[in-house]
Amino acid sequence: MFNESDAPQPPKVLSTPLEIAANLRQLQESHDPLIITFHDRSHRFQSYVVHVDRESNTLALDEMIPRDGEKFIENGEHFRVEGFHDGVRIAWECDHALKISEVDGHRCYSGPLPQEVTYHQRRNAFRAALKLSQLVDIILDGAHLKGNGAMRGKLLDISATGCKLRFEGNVEDRLQLGQVYERFKAGNPLGLVDTMVELRHLHYEERINTTFAGVRFHNLSGQAQRKIESFVYQLQREARRFDKDDY
């Protein structure tokens, strides 16, 4: 639905255990990917919330991707966590040592719940989902793409600032979180050529043998920005007209 609540909101700082646990649990239940950045280090790592318990004041994060980020956890280095849930940015600082343990037989990092969480609703960047019958073909390529040849996939949804992509099979080992790929192309009717994108989210869904990637547009030209905004506006109009309740 489209109303004034979709307008941008200033960030809020959540400080009560109830609010913090509720928002972290949303990230857990939706399996929303997290971006982890260690202070004074350029690499980004991906994880997920796997356990939230307000009663015992504990939080557990899934094993990091790539795994080599674990050595920074072992060193007790501080880091920042950032996730997105339904257009809301949820972020916090981890400034204490975490314990490497297991939850349901899977490796994880556990510690206390954060004392503060930043909650920032960013609905102003309308994200338009494409119907399955209308998915746009995309090509992802660039100097830092691992493996042989460009990657071909589908555009699932798009906003003025980024888009979600789908690739057949497990392609996680070909991509690096935080990396910029300079040759992203999208077929008609969007028609983007050699656009720069930054990889923000990456998740392989084994059940359907599909990899999902979230990218943010990087240094867009004026022409590309206008193409994207026009395409989003077109999708927005169609969504209002045909599928109000679905968007």
UniProtKB/Swiss-Prot annotation:
Consequence the record notes for mutating residue 162 to A: Loss of c-di-GMP binding
Residues in PilZ domain copies: 121-234
Quaternary structure and interacting proteins, as annotated: Interacts with the flagellar basal bodies. Monomer. Binding of c-di-GMP produces a dimer to monomer transition.
Alphabetically ordered keywords of this record: Bacterial flagellum, c-di-GMP, Nucleotide-binding
Subcellular location field: Bacterial flagellum basal body
Pfam assignment, any one: PilZ
Ligand binding (3',3'-c-di-GMP): 121-127
Native organism: Pseudomonas putida (strain ATCC 47054 / DSM 6125 / CFBP 8728 / NCIMB 11950 / KT2440)
Database matches in SUPFAM superfamilies: PilZ domain-like
Recorded GO CC terms: bacterial-type flagellum basal body
Outcome of mutating residue 122 to L: 4-fold decreased affinity for c-di-GMP, binds 1 c-di-GMP per monomer
Function, as annotated: Acts as a flagellar brake, regulating swimming and swarming in a bis-(3'-5') cyclic diguanylic acid (c-di-GMP)-dependent manner. Increasing levels of c-di-GMP lead to decreased motility. Binds c-di-GMP with a dissociation constant of 165 nM. Binds 2 intercalated (c-di-GMP) dimers per subunit.
Lineage start: Bacteria, Pseudomonadati, Pseudomonadota, Gammaproteobacteria, Pseudomonadales
Similarity comment: family membership: Belongs to the YcgR family.
GO molecular function, one term: cyclic-di-GMP binding
A GO biological process held by the record: bacterial-type flagellum-dependent cell motility
Presence of the UniProt keyword Nucleotide-binding in the record: yes
Protein name in the entry: Flagellar brake protein YcgR
